[in-house]
């Protein structure tokens, strides 16, 4: 059994296979996932798992050089936005419109669907390098 905190086998495999600049999205329960993009559906019920919990676990495994979020998160979900800033720390954040973020998910290696019911809780993480 793995010793690290991420134990979802498919998600672990996807992260391990990501190269520099590849992207992966973490989505709330309502974000449309484009056809042809892998869906890793973790949603069990309303707010399980939460968006921020899922982000913390993924950040424990993935080297991230940039995070992309929708500008709408700041206004529509300010508490989540404030916590997100703390979690991301020094990772640069790019803000785009929600519509642009949805288009950008077409290029992601996968979209991780959570049970999150808070609006605009979506993020795209761009893989960095550890050296």
Swiss-Prot record:
It catalyses: beta-D-ribopyranose = beta-D-ribofuranose. Its EC number is 5.4.99.62. It is found in: Cytoplasm. Keywords: Carbohydrate metabolism, Cytoplasm, Isomerase. The active site is at 20 (proton donor). It is an enzyme of class 5 (isomerase). GO terms for biological process: D-ribose catabolic process. Substrate binds at residues 28, 98, 120-122. The keyword Transmembrane helix does not apply. One of its GO terms (cellular component) is cytosol. One of its GO terms (molecular function) is intramolecular lyase activity. Catalyzes the interconversion of beta-pyran and beta-furan forms of D-ribose. Homodecamer. Belongs to the RbsD / FucU family. RbsD subfamily. This is D-ribose pyranase. The lineage of its organism: Bacteria, Pseudomonadati, Coprothermobacterota, Coprothermobacteria, Coprothermobacterales.
């Amino acid at each position: 059994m793995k010793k690290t905190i991420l134990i979802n086998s498919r998600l672990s495999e996807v992260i391990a296979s990501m190269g520099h600049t590849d992207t992966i999205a973490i989505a709330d329960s309502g974000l449309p996932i484009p056809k042809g993009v892998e869906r890793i559906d973790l949603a069990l019920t309303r707010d399980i798992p939460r968006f921020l919990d899922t982000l913390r676990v993924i950040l424990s495994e993935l080297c991230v050089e940039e995070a992309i979020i929708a500008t709408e998160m700041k206004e529509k979900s300010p508490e989540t936005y404030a916590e997100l800033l703390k979690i991301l720390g020094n990772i640069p954040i790019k803000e785009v419109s929600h519509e642009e973020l949805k288009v950008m998910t077409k290029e992601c290696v996968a979209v991780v669907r959570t049970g999150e019911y808070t609006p605009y809780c979506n993020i795209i993480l761009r893989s960095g390098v550890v050296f």
